[in-house]
Regions:
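Bacterial c-di-GMP phosphodiesterase EAL domain
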Residues: 165-286
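Alpha-helical scaffold within the catalytic cores of cyclic-nucleotide enzymes
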Residues: 76-86, 111-132, 239-249
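C-di-GMP signaling machinery
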Residues: 1-32, 41-43, 143-188, 196, ...
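EAL-family c-di-GMP phosphodiesterase catalytic domain
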Residues: 2-8, 209, 295-302, 324-423
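Conserved long alpha-helical elements within nucleotide-processing catalytic cores of c-di-GMP signaling
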Residues: 5, 9-36, 43-50, 57-80, ...
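Conserved helix-loop-beta segment at the catalytic/binding core of cyclic-nucleotide signaling proteins
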Residues: 49, 79-109, 132
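EAL-type cyclic di-GMP phosphodiesterase domain
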Residues: 62-66, 212-238, 265-273, 284-320, ...
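Cyclic nucleotide signaling catalytic output domains
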Residues: 118, 122, 138-173, 221, ...
Length: 423
């Protein structure tokens, strides 16, 4: 039954009146022209506009091999929610089996973001019975000049090319934003403390931006609302290059650090971002590979992707091992089993040390890591109470202000007991 449905399912024609049909080029062009006119009248600007993108990839990842069977159900719900959430002149078009482009009226990008978030939430709610674990779509927007880009457009091929061009231009602008401020970036290294035995086992590298007042802030203040992963990919390359300056052959082994360097999921998942980053990584001398650990991160910790093993295959043999950043949810840790990751770095930013249930929750997280064959790292640990709770719960490692402050240059692993006796 599933095979029949898969063969018969097509993205076109759309299932609602709000959908654009590339098979009808005359109507395709006429509806885009009406949208441009309405948007110009609304905004008062010829260059205004944002393209909405609804990404169904998280649902496909969650469904795994069942995707081909449930895809018609997913799309029926997606199109129904779009039809309900869009105005008469507004449009959507399926770009591929996991991507919808939304052309809607909005005076500013934020307004469209809010509307798309509501539509995405509606889709996720309707799919609760189909996608276990509550997997839902991701909505985002990118600036898109309706007046110029939609003019003289009569088909999907032209629209696809213009969207890709807009994405390339935006990616270049976001990457340039970081390069323009590269001299203000600072690489810092935070010690990672083992809890069973007081050892500094390594350092987590991270970047900060030095302001005119001398304060250090997160680099994302330069690009708080990215439409592509270009800014993060540029930051990943910059930080990897800084870390590699501390992994130079010829230094005594006792002086060499062990470094965990972050890379964003979007960097590894996007060929155009992954290639330059991997090219830099290959410059690391083979003898230094045991000293470099990769930490897969997101700006906000997410559940691991279904294709994590394939994603990590690109770095196999080029780093000592991989850590994956996850939210504080045992169900987000279980999928790491067999993925190639060796540890989970658990986000502690939402944990309340004063909550009596925190120790129990930490114990569940530590147990989930052990069940998946992983070491557990809790970050950031901001105070001594949470550090002690992590120790009591069986967490393996912690890093944060409660341990030791970050350094401008990392040092070698250190037994804190010996260091204490030496002083």
């Amino acid at each position: 039954m599933g095979e029949v449905r898969e063969r018969s399912f097509e993205l076109y024609p759309p299932r609602t009146r709000a959908g654009l049909d590339p098979g009808l080029p005359g109507e395709f062009a006429a509806r885009l022209a009406r949208l441009r006119k309405a948007h110009r009248e609304l905004s008062g600007r010829r260059d205004a506009g944002s393209l909405g993108v609804i990404d169904l990839a998280p649902i496909k990842e969650r469904m795994g091999p069942r995707w081909d069977i449930v895809r018609p159900i997913v799309w029926a719900n997606v199109e129904a929610c779009l039809a309900r959430g869009l105005e008469d002149v507004e449009l959507y078009v399926a770009a591929d089996e996991v991507t919808v482009w939304v052309l809607a009226l909005a005076r500013e990008r934020r307004e469209l973001e809010r509307r798309l978030a509501l539509i995405a939430a509606d889709i996720g709610e309707r799919l609760l019975g189909v996608a276990p674990g509550g997997a839902g779509p991701v909505a985002r927007t990118l600036p898109f000049d309706y007046e110029t880009e939609l003019a003289t457009l009569a088909g999907m091929l032209g629209l696809r090319e213009r969207v890709r061009r807009a994405q390339r231009q935006l990616a270049e602008a976001e990457a340039a934003r970081l390069r323009e401020h590269a001299t203000e970036l600072v690489a810092l290294y935070r010690p990672v403390l083992a809890l069973r035995v007081p050892l500094i086992v390594g350092f987590r590298a991270f970047a900060r931006l030095a302001t005119a007042s001398g304060a250090l802030v997160v680099p994302w203040t330069l690009c708080p609302d990215p439409a592509t992963g270009a800014f993060d990919a540029e930051l990943d390359r910059w930080l990897l290059a800084q870390a590699m300056t501390h992994l130079v052959p010829g230094r005594p082994k006792a002086e060499l650090p062990v470094l965990a360097v972050p890379v964003h999921r979007s960097t590894l998942a996007t060929p155009g971002f992954r290639g330059p980053w991997l090219n830099l990584l290959t410059e690391l001398p083979a003898v230094m590979i045991p000293r470099l650990i990769l930490e897969l991160v997101d700006r906000t910790p997410q559940r691991p992707p279904a294709d994590l093993r394939g994603m990590l295959a690109s770095v196999e043999g080029r780093v000592a091992f991989v850590i994956v950043r996850v939210p504080p949810d045992p169900s987000a840790i279980a999928p790491l089993a067999g993925s190639g990751a060796r540890a989970a770095s658990i986000d502690a930013s939402t944990l309340d040390p004063a909550d009596p249930g925190t120790v129990v929750r930490l114990a569940e997280l530590a147990a989930a890591c052990r069940a998946a064959g992983l070491r557990s790292l809790l970050v950031p640990v901001a105070n001594a109470v949470l550090a002690e709770e992590a120790r009591a719960a069986g967490i393996d490692y912690i890093a944060g202000d409660a341990c030791l402050p970050p350094l401008r240059a990392p040092g070698p692993p250190m037994d804190l007991r010996k260091a204490a006796r030496a002083t």
